[in-house]
Design a protein with these regions (language model features):
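Short, well-ordered beta-strand segments
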Residues: 1-5, 49, 73, 98, ...
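A late-sequence structural motif
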Residues: 14, 164-203
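Beta->alpha turn/N-cap motifs
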Residues: 33-34, 51-55, 75-76, 128, ...
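Central regulatory/effector-binding core of bacterial HTH transcription factors
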Residues: 1-58, 212
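Paired acidic/hydrophobic, glycine-rich loop segments that form the ligand-binding mouth/hinge
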Residues: 47-51, 141-145, 162
Length: 212
């Protein structure tokens, strides 16, 4: 089996088609935050990883993949209750928030980008991409969801963007052990091709990183 470290959001949105392009391979996936996926490489526990860091792990090659776009979203009812006057610092500090795991800093980064302040709202820890989305749809809290998963909900009105003009793009990278690179060349090609079809060109300057 090929052991990989991958973010949950990438797995839920675009990685599976890449794996399907190399049906001769079997996979053992370690799901982790993209900010820390490279630690699996440093420990020698995986052959490759989708990471959120442009710095190359020792003994690895790095390939930029593009960026996943995230949108701060909530249900219409939640918006009326907590954000009647928009996502102000006061409102964000009081509104329940979704967090994937303690490693997930995306919501905090978005709030600081939006308000200029470091806020600590009440939050739910919910380490599941689809539960994260369901929680937003059902009005439990707001959270940063991949645009690929929420675009239809935004069109239908089931979800509302807290600020439609303030998306966040999370750059992703494919890092692979040089020792394993020749044997995994078909997988690398599949990853790069699939990423090019699904991800956005990364922002010139971006430090926003998440579980995905």
């Amino acid at each position: 089996r090929v052991t990989l470290a991958v973010p949950a959001d990438a797995l839920a949105t675009w990685l599976i088609p890449a794996f399907a392009d190399v049906p001769e391979m079997l996979f053992d996936l370690k799901v982790d935050d993209q900010d820390t996926a490279d630690e699996w490489l440093k420990r020698g526990a995986v052959s490759a990883a989708v990471t959120g860091h442009a710095r190359t792990a020792p003994g690895c090659d790095l390939f930029p993949l593009g960026a996943m776009r995230y949108i701060a979203t909530a249900s219409p009812e939640f918006m009326k209750k907590y954000f009647a006057n928009g996502p102000t610092a006061e409102a964000l500090a009081a509104a329940p928030m979704l967090t994937f795991t303690p490693k997930d800093k995306l919501q905090s980064q978005w709030m600081k980008q939006t308000t200029g302040k470091v806020l600590h709202p009440p939050c739910h820890l919910m380490p599941s991409t689809h539960a994260f989305l369901d929680a937003a749809l059902l009005g439990l809290a707001w959270g940063m969801n991949p645009l690929a998963l929420v675009s239809e909900h935004l069109k239908s009105g089931n979800l509302v963007a807290l600020d439609a003009q303030a998306p966040m793009d999370v750059p992703l990278y494919w890092q692979i052990s040089r020792v394993m690179a020749p044997a995994l060349a078909p997988l690398t090609r599949a990853i790069l091709t699939t990423a090019a079809a699904h991800l956005r060109p990364p922002l010139a300057k971006s430090s926003q990183n998440r579980h995905i």
